[in-house]
């Protein structure tokens, strides 16, 4: 029997350097393709044929498995690696087989969805892989009792199987009906139209996510009550908006909700006036910097800025495209839209705004005892500063406080803060005390 221990030839703790075991892939099989065309998965094996040792083979096999999942055609994928057999087998050859289980011809789902300071009920009916190369058709509907309701029919086409697969190009066409309520200003907008979207990644120096959209929609502004100022009534009625929208995102954070390090940058630019009777340009930018300190403490600095301007074809800036500053996602200590210009005590939105936030995040005191539970909670101290229709520090608003945040599945968070407004204007709607917020992008 072999000995165990330092002098033995075999040990339960023996380790092998897989990078020193020569290996090459002779053949790759993908089984389970029922409705999918073969050329859609052909490029999945590109990395496997470059493997020169067993460690590379294992890593590339896992990468290929992830790639097959991203194609959007399989429920699950399993990997089998076996020695290569047959007359054409090489001495260190292996055969890799991926067994996939294709998605059903029709799928449905229902659940909740987190938006910016709102939650909604969402249902979706999807026909996946309809043409055999990852194309999807989906009918989506969402309902919220607070702000927005949506109905959307969407056709989505990925191009992951092309030679540009590393760029993850995607294209979609949507027909939508969207209703947004602005209770603070007593109006709502109903948009009916279509949207064409093309998105891709670029990795020249840094990894950026780009999205280029064309939207054509009828925007109808309606009133929620009779006692609305004329400045808002003047915007009522349907108008046709035709616009281009470009957005770019850079994100190297180590987490979406409670990051400990990294930078997040996002920019959205719109040009409206390609047709119809609505014309303007709009730009918004959001930035976030996270710096680890000690004992689990993290310093976070956030900023957001937005500007909407007239063009030579502008007759009136649409009220739904103006900025509403204030609320738990921008300026804590103020009600939603409560830090901005007003007409007859009614907020009407601003053509520009800026706000910043400094945070000190800390784990809960008992984080070491209840590790799994405590990882979903954080305490923070914050100080927010902002203003609208002016980029100076005169007449700016500010507030500080502390609160508790809860993570929701790495996608959003809930905050319960105690806020103390420091600087505000007489017409502002302040909130001195507890404030509740839910969303995925905070300042």
UniProtKB/Swiss-Prot annotation:
<dbReference type="InterPro" id="IPR034746">
    <property type="entry name" value="POTRA"/>
</dbReference>
<dbReference type="Pfam" id="PF01103">
    <property type="entry name" value="Omp85"/>
</dbReference>
<keyword id="KW-0472">Membrane</keyword>
<protein>
    <recommendedName>
        <fullName>SAM50-like protein CG7639</fullName>
    </recommendedName>
</protein>
<keyword id="KW-0496">Mitochondrion</keyword>
<dbReference type="GO" id="GO:0032977">
    <property type="term" value="F:membrane insertase activity"/>
</dbReference>
<dbReference type="GO" id="GO:0005741">
    <property type="term" value="C:mitochondrial outer membrane"/>
</dbReference>
<dbReference type="GO" id="GO:0001401">
    <property type="term" value="C:SAM complex"/>
</dbReference>
<comment type="subunit">
    <text>Associates with the mitochondrial contact site and cristae organizing system (MICOS) complex (also known as MINOS or MitOS complex).</text>
</comment>
<keyword id="KW-1134">Transmembrane beta strand</keyword>
<dbReference type="GO" id="GO:0030150">
    <property type="term" value="P:protein import into mitochondrial matrix"/>
</dbReference>
<comment type="function">
    <text>May play a role in the maintenance of the structure of mitochondrial cristae.</text>
</comment>
<dbReference type="GO" id="GO:0045040">
    <property type="term" value="P:protein insertion into mitochondrial outer membrane"/>
</dbReference>
<dbReference type="InterPro" id="IPR000184">
    <property type="entry name" value="Bac_surfAg_D15"/>
</dbReference>
<feature type="domain" description="POTRA">
    <location>
        <begin position="23"/>
        <end position="101"/>
    </location>
</feature>
<keyword id="KW-0812">Transmembrane</keyword>
<dbReference type="GO" id="GO:0033108">
    <property type="term" value="P:mitochondrial respiratory chain complex assembly"/>
</dbReference>
<dbReference type="InterPro" id="IPR039910">
    <property type="entry name" value="D15-like"/>
</dbReference>
<keyword id="KW-1000">Mitochondrion outer membrane</keyword>
<comment type="similarity">
    <text>Belongs to the SAM50/omp85 family.</text>
</comment>
<dbReference type="GO" id="GO:0008320">
    <property type="term" value="F:protein transmembrane transporter activity"/>
</dbReference>
């Amino acid at each position: 029997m072999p000995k165990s221990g330092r002098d033995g030839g075999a040990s339960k703790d023996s380790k092998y350097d897989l990078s020193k075991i020569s290996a090459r892939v002779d053949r790759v099989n993908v089984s389970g393709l029922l409705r999918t065309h073969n050329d859609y998965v052909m490029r999945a094996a590109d990395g496997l044929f470059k493997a020169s040792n067993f460690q590379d083979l294992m890593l590339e096999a896992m990468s290929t498995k992830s790639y097959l999942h991203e194609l959007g055609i399989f429920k699950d994928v399993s990997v089998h690696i076996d020695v290569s057999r047959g007359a054409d087998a090489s001495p260190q050859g292996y055969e890799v087989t991926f067994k996939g289980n294709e998605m059903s011809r029709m799928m449905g789902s229902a659940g909740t969805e987190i938006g910016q300071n709102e939650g909604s009920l969402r249902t979706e009916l999807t026909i996946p892989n309809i043409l055999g190369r990852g194309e999807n058709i989906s009918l989506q509907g969402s309902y919220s009792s607070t702000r927005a309701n949506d109905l959307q029919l969407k056709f989505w086409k990925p191009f992951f199987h092309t030679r540009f697969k590393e760029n993850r190009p995607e294209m979609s066409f949507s027909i939508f009906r969207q209703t947004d309520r602005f209770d603070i200003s007593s109006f709502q907008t109903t948009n009916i139209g279509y949207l064409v979207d093309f998105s891709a990644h670029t990795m020249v120096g840094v990894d950026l996510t780009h999205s280029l959209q064309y939207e054509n929609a009828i925007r109808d502004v309606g009133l929620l009550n009779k006692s609305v100022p004329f400045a808002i009534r003047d915007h009522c009625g349907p108008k046709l908006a035709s616009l281009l929208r470009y957005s770019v995102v850079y994100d190297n954070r180590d987490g979406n909700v409670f990051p400990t390090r990294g930078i997040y940058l996002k920019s959205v630019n719109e040009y409206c006036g390609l047709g119809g009777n609505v014309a303007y340009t709009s730009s918004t930018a959001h930035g976030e910097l996270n710096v680890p300190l000690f004992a689990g403490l993290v310093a976070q600095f956030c900023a957001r800025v937005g500007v909407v301007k007239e063009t030579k074809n502008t007759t009136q800036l649409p009220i739904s495209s103006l900025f509403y500053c204030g609320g738990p996602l921008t300026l804590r200590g103020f009600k939603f839209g409560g830090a901005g210009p007003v007409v007859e005590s009614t907020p009407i939105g601003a053509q520009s705004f800026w706000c910043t936030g400094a945070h000190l995040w800390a784990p809960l005191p008992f984080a070491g005892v209840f590790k799994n539970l405590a990882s979903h909670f954080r305490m923070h101290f914050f100080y927010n500063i902002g203003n609208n229709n002016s980029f100076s520090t005169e007449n700016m608003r500010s507030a500080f406080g502390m609160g508790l945040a809860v993570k929701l599945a790495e996608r959003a968070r809930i905050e319960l803060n105690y806020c103390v407004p420091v600087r505000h204007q007489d017409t502002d709607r302040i909130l001195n005390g507890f404030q509740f917020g839910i969303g995925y992008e905070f300042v």
